[in-house]
């Protein structure tokens, strides 16, 4: 099957004797540009960067730090100190708080063929995390790749995103135990998915530019989902892999509902997203079983 599809790969045992995994083989080791943007739930950028530098086996990467005008002076000083490293550079964002626009500007400064958008509250777990994501994103039919993120208490933060849950979008398998295999093995098997969060999102620069990058109208939320759906529109696949593992030091209580109470922008961007992607949302998430509940992220049967 892999040979017919033109995907050189080695097949290995997976999580169990009945599940297998394909290790896709590529002759190139492209430069990966890791773009880190500041957020409100960070430990600090220094810990994230140290984690990358100490625990990443893949040698060919650069780090781009987005420095916005609202950062505290001590944070700005920290960024400048970090930027003295050979791998690390900064890009200043002087505009208003806009995640999409800031990251689009950062992309302009990157030298890599592959982009990795990363929150500054991330801690690397396995040394080959970049290789695990890269093997998928280098496939010509793949647009973006997401990783397996854990909360600090070792419960699952997400296995990708599901559209339609709670009339919006929610994390797949949120709060599941660390060692859970998930719904039909989804937490231990690489699989296609509709959308991926930008907390750890890898995409080829060519694909990112082809779809127009992040939509600046999504300054606070939905920019990553919009990007994912634009990638699907171009007939690329979005892939989630359980073999790239990271901790995300993000509060369990912080989600779209809590943001709504604090930010009027969220309601406007939500309405814009629902209008822009009305046809897709009406049809339902193609990677989610229509017999399952849309009330929770636990893959339980829908009670009609």
Task: Report residues per predicted region.
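C-terminal, non-catalytic tails of nucleotide-sugar-dependent glycosyltransferases
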Residues: 1-32, 153, 165-192, 238, ...
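Short, acidic, metal-binding catalytic loop of nucleotide-sugar glycosyltransferases
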Residues: 50-60
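Glycine-rich, basic loop-to-helix element that forms the pyrophosphate-binding segment
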Residues: 93-110
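Conserved donor NDP-sugar-binding/catalytic core segment of glycosyltransferases
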Residues: 122-168
């Amino acid at each position: 099957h892999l040979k017919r599809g033109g995907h050189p790969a080695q097949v290995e045992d997976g999580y169990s004797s009945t599940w297998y995994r394909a290790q896709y083989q590529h002759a190139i080791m492209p430069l990966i540009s890791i773009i880190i943007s500041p957020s409100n739930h960070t430990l600090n950028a220094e810990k994230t960067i140290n984690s990358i530098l100490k625990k990443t086996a893949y040698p060919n990467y650069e780090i781009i730090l987005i420095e916005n005008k609202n950062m505290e002076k001590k944070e700005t000083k920290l960024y400048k100190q970090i930027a003295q490293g050979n791998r690390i550079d900064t890009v200043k964002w002087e505009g208003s708080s806009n995640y999409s626009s800031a990251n689009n500007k950062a992309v302009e400064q990157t030298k890599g063929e592959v982009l990795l958008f990363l929150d500054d509250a991330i801690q690397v777990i396995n040394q080959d995390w970049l290789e695990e994501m890269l093997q998928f994103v280098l496939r010509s039919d793949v647009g973006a790749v997401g990783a397996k993120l854990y909360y600090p208490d070792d419960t699952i933060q997400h296995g990708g995103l599901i559209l339609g849950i709670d009339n919006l979008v929610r994390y797949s398998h949120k709060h599941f135990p660390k060692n859970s295999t998930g719904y039909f093995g989804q937490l231990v098997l690489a699989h296609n998915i509709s959308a991926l969060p930008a907390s750890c999102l890898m995409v080829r620069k060519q694909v990112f530019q082809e779809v127009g990058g992040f939509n600046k109208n999504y300054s606070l939320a939905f920019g990553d989902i919009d990007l994912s759906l634009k990638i699907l529109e171009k007939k690329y696949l979005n892939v989630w892999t359980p073999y790239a593992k990271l901790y995300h030091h993000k509060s369990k209580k912080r989600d779209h509902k809590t943001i709504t109470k604090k930010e009027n922008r969220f309601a406007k961007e939500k309405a814009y997203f629902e209008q822009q992607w009305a046809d897709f949302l009406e049809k339902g998430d193609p990677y989610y079983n229509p017999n399952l509940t849309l009330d929770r992220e636990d893959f339980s049967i829908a009670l009609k």
